[in-house]
From Swiss-Prot:
Cell compartment(s), UniProt: Cytoplasm
Pfam families assigned: dsrm, Ribonucleas_3_3
Principal EC category: hydrolase
Biological process (GO), any one: tRNA processing
Species in which this protein is naturally found: Sodalis glossinidius (strain morsitans)
This protein's GO CC annotations: cytoplasm
Subunit structure: Homodimer.
Name of this protein: Ribonuclease 3
């Protein structure tokens, strides 16, 4: 691993690892090594959920559980994490196997998002819960400042369905058109047919549900609702 890249990444993250092997493991996809980042990802996912839930609870004392759940889902969903990964220029530091490199895995949203969670898990093991909580809140400062309760936090499929129902239009249809990769690391491609759009909208994700949500989000953008 190029030390120039990892040093630059740590500056962007705002954290320097004491145990460098944890950083390397967090950046390692299962296609590259048996010592990959999935256990760190599991840990980081839980820590991220706790930190964001606690931040929302403190910021919005009058907001009900449903709205807080929707806001948390918006903040921790895959495309938000992938967007953050691109801000960190994380793709250049990923350790991928030859197949993933060839297929552009360093750009794949699911891999980028999973790696952010793995880094959170790695930082926790390298330090403590207070340190990783402060770091996550630093990463999320602008997003937490911008987010607010309300319909905007409903997931894209729900918002698309409500939009169409409100206009007495047929509900969207979702069709799996491609599944790539092995069982542990698949990428689904979905076509979403929406009344009012001439062509099916395409969505990709690491599960059918995520791909459908991605397609619905694209449809909302085309309908100028996003």
């Amino acid at each position: 691993m190029n030390p120039i890249l990892t040093n630059r990444l740590q500056k962007k993250l705002g954290y320097t690892f004491q145990q460098h092997d944890l950083l390397l493991q967090a950046l390692t996809h299962r296609s590259a090594s048996s010592k990959h980042n999935e256990r760190l990802e599991f840990l980081g996912d839980s820590i991220l959920s706790y930190v964001i839930a606690n931040a929302l609870y403190q910021r919005f004392p009058r907001v009900d559980e449903g709205d807080m759940s929707r806001m948390r889902a918006t903040l921790v969903r895959g495309n938000t994490l992938a967007e953050m990964a691109r801000e960190f220029e994380l793709g250049e530091c990923l350790r991928l196997g030859p197949g993933e490199l060839k297929s552009g895995g360093f750009r794949r949203e699911s891999i980028l998002a999973d790696t952010v969670e793995a880094l959170i898990g790695g930082v926790f093991l390298d330090s403590d819960i207070r340190t990783v909580e402060k770091l996550i809140l630093d990463w999320y400062r602008s997003r937490l400042d911008e987010i607010s309760p309300g319909d905007k936090q409903k997931d894209p499929k729900t918002r698309l369905q409500e939009y169409l129902q409100g206009r007495h239009l047929p509900l969207p249809t979702y069709q799996v058109v491609q599944v790539r990769g092995e069982a542990h690391d698949q990428e689904f491609t979905i076509h979403c047919q929406v009344s009012g759009l001439a062509q099916p909208v395409v969505g990709n994700g690491s599960s059918r549900r995520k791909a459908e949500q991605a397609a619905a989000e694209q449809a909302l953008k085309l309908l100028e609702l996003e």
